[in-house]
């Protein structure tokens, strides 16, 4: 969330950002937020003054009694102070709650390099790598191809769990595992520490990493518990150090999460409806970095380069897009997507999201870094995250781009050591 001090000092920056996002509803919140904040602070002053007066009256009553003076007026005032304090505290709490409500829902301040646009059609391409694959035969649907070869079973998975699930079998399981291990090994060589997080989170922690008002509809809630299945390892790793203070020497902290991911909402989009691209459960390797504020933009480019290296070494053509104001969401100050070439649809499809969240998550979670020259001086860290690989989407890309005329699939060379030297699926 935004720091209330920033909103107080720079309300016009907040308003300009919301206009850039064309978020008129939240733009209308800013004046009320400032008014409620002012009211809460005024009530705090009033409460402090009433408490001071309460102590002062006690002394005055004692002195009056010693002097044999009438204390009835002072006693009446003293009896009324608790009521006044309670009223002021109630008003203060109501105002603070409203301020907190607004702050938890206002989006991050966008970087100036984020393009203005209404939706994903106005994202801006910034880079291409590789030549889009063109085949001289009709490419089979990856889901049907997987079923034909006995690599996947969607029908039986639907009987067991419903639509959007799958059984992987045989060499497809090895491919899934190979992709995870390949991506993790790449990150470890680049200074990341592997992390297996809890696969469930409580609501308080989840509210720290994302706006549940936007995100809750895509998540699985555990009935009867204040717990959710994770949608990505980014979320538990982001909340891992909540309420803690880093020393500068320990930053940047580069973590590589490995986990299954669970998503309720998968959509229904043409050729994606049966297969591995839009599913309720998949495996993902995620990059997450805690760093000093002055380092975050350099690290944003670094984690993008890591994700690009994954797809370059897999030999899968892709492009990078700079996500526009109408598509970026609440948390990121800037986001890149990598979209890989899908030759059957003759288009690029998203496989990586790479975000610099600046201090937005750290403010919600109260994660700071201490100034090494001033023990009492602390500031919020910056957090960044990026997919390294989501295996279900990468497998679809491999099944399409590397599909052969006879229906076999060429395994990317970098994965073969993880698959017992197998060359073709």
From Swiss-Prot:
The record's GO CC annotations read:
cytoplasm
Q: What keywords appear on the UniProt entry?
A: Aminoacyl-tRNA synthetase, ATP-binding, Cytoplasm, Ligase, Nucleotide-binding, Protein biosynthesis
Name the Enzyme Commission number(s) assigned to this protein. 6.1.1.11
Checking Pfam families in the record gives: Seryl_tRNA_N, tRNA-synt_2b
Annotated GO biological process: selenocysteine biosynthetic process; seryl-tRNA aminoacylation
This entry's Gene Ontology molecular function terms read: ATP binding; serine-tRNA ligase activity
InterPro entries listed in its UniProt record: aa-tRNA-synt_IIb, aa-tRNA-synth_II, aa-tRNA-synth_II/BPL/LPL, Ser-tRNA-ligase_type_1, Ser-tRNA-synth_1_N, SerRS_1_N_sf, SerRS_core, tRNA-bd_arm
The protein's location, in the record's own words, is:
Cytoplasm
Answer yes or no on keyword Nucleotide-binding. Answer: yes
Q: Residues that bind ATP, according to the entry?
A: 263-265, 279, 350-353
Residues that coordinate or bind L-serine: 232-234, 286, 387
Which pathway does UniProt place it in? Aminoacyl-tRNA biosynthesis; selenocysteinyl-tRNA(Sec) biosynthesis; L-seryl-tRNA(Sec) from L-serine and tRNA(Sec): step 1/1
Catalysed reactions, as listed in the record: tRNA(Ser) + L-serine + ATP = L-seryl-tRNA(Ser) + AMP + diphosphate + H(+); tRNA(Sec) + L-serine + ATP = L-seryl-tRNA(Sec) + AMP + diphosphate + H(+)
Q: Would you identify the family this protein belongs to, as annotated?
A: Belongs to the class-II aminoacyl-tRNA synthetase family. Type-1 seryl-tRNA synthetase subfamily.
Tell me the NCBIfam families matching this sequence: serS (TIGR00414)
Physiological role: Catalyzes the attachment of serine to tRNA(Ser). Is also able to aminoacylate tRNA(Sec) with serine, to form the misacylated tRNA L-seryl-tRNA(Sec), which will be further converted into selenocysteinyl-tRNA(Sec).
Subunit field text: Homodimer. The tRNA molecule binds across the dimer.
Recorded domain comment: Consists of two distinct domains, a catalytic core and a N-terminal extension that is involved in tRNA binding.
What this protein is called in its record is Serine--tRNA ligase
Q: Which organism is it from?
A: Methanocella arvoryzae (strain DSM 22066 / NBRC 105507 / MRE50)
């Amino acid at each position: 969330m935004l720091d209330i001090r920033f909103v107080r000092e720079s309300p016009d920056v907040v308003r300009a950002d919301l206009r850039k996002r064309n978020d008129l509803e939240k733009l209308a919140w800013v004046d009320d937020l400032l008014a409620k904040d002012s009211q809460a602070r005024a009530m705090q002053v009033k409460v402090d003054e009433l408490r001071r007066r309460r102590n002062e009256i006690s002394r005055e009553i004692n002195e009056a009694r010693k002097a044999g003076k009438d204390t009835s007026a002072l006693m009446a005032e003293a009896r009324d102070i608790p009521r006044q304090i309670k009223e002021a505290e109630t008003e203060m709490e109501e105002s603070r709650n409203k301020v907190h409500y607004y702050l938890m829902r206002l989006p991050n301040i966008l970087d100036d390099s984020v393009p203005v646009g209404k939706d994903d059609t106005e994202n801006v391409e910034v880079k291409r790598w590789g030549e889009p694959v063109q085949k001289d035969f009709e490419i089979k649907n990856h889901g049907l191809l997987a079923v034909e070869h006995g690599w996947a079973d969607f029908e039986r998975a639907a009987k067991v769990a419903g639509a959007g699930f799958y059984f992987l079998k045989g060499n497809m399981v090895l491919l899934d595992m190979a992709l995870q291990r390949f991506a993790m090994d790449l990150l470890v060589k680049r200074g990341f520490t592997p992390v297996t997080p809890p696969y469930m989170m409580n609501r308080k922690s989840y509210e720290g990493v994302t706006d549940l008002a936007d995100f809750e509809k895509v998540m699985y809630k555990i009935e009867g518990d204040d717990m959710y299945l994770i949608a990505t390892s980014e979320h538990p790793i982001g909340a891992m150090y909540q309420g803690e203070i880093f020393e500068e020497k320990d930053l940047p902290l580069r973590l590589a999460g490995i986990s299954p991911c669970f998503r309720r909402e998968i959509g229904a989009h043409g050729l994606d409806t049966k297969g591995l691209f839009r599913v309720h459960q998949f495996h993902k390797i995620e990059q997450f970095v805690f760093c000093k504020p002055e380092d975050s933009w350099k690290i944003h480019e670094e984690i993008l380069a890591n994700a690009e290296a994954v797809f370059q070494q897999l030999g899968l053509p892709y492009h990078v897009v700079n996500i526009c104001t109408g598509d970026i969401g609440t948390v990121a100050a800037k986001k890149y997507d990598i979209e890989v070439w899908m030759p059957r649809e003759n288009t690029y499809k998203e496989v990586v999201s790479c975000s610099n969240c600046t201090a937005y998550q750290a403010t919600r979670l109260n994660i700071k870094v201490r100034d090494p020259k001033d023990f009492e001086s602390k500031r919020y860290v910056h957090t960044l995250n990026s997919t390294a690989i989501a295996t279900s989407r990468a497998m679809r890309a491999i099944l399409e781009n590397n599909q052969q005329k006879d229906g076999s699939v060429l395994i990317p060379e970098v994965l073969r050591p993880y698959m017992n030297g197998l060359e073709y699926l």
